[in-house]
Amino acid sequence: MSKNTKVNAAILIIGNEILSGRTQDTNTSTLATWLNSIGVKVNEVRIIPDQEEIIVETLNLLRKSNNYVFTTGGIGPTHDDITAQSVAKAFGLKYELHKEGYKILEAYYQPGEFNEGRQKMIWMPANADLILNPTSGAPGFSVENVFCLPGVPSIMKSMLGGLKNKIVGGDPILSYTCLLYTSPSPR
């Protein structure tokens, strides 16, 4: 893509905790601000539940109509973290242990701490590219134009710097707010 091409993205927030109101989404603002700064216009944001069929359907729709799709949430160690397997299904790829990711997490944790739950975080679509995590070790991943990041805001934000060379944007998108106060004019 040339620098003058208009580049767009969608943000897909995945998590029942967001939809129930238990957790407030701050990732949308962080991602949109960062994307605008590198010349990527956010066209759409969706918040969906931790349900495989909904994730697959939504992801397939968004990845075909946007240059990039960024997901947050659902790549952690718990039973409801199903984003990685859903992405694999959306792309028709195997869901497997990522060998490089395994080495990274094995080195990150103390002996005996790299348990089954933590190992779940390095199961990804086959041939996924890692997105390194300078905060907590567990990497995100990308497949084609889809970038999967964790839902924890501070961790997600810390990983954005590692994406700069993977995202081709346009001119930065600037916005401002203008407040205009008026008083009624006498008739």
PLM features: residue spans?
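N-terminal amphipathic/basic leader segments beginning at the initiator methionine
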Residues: 2-8
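Glycine-rich phosphate/diphosphate-binding loop of Rossmann-like nucleotide-binding domains
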Residues: 8-38, 44-45
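Short glycine-rich or small-residue beta-strand-to-loop segments that form or flank ligand, phosphate
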Residues: 12-14, 19, 68-73, 147-148
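Short glycine-rich anion-binding loops that position phosphate/pyrophosphate groups of nucleotides
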Residues: 16-17, 74-77, 153-155
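N-terminal small/polar loop signature for handling phosphorylated ligands or for N-terminal nucleophile
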Residues: 29-82, 89
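Proline/glycine-rich low-complexity loops and linkers
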Residues: 57, 82-170
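Short glycine-/aliphatic-rich beta-strand segments at the starts of folded cytosolic domains
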Residues: 170-180
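Conserved small/polar residues in nucleotide/adenosyl-binding loops
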Residues: 181-186
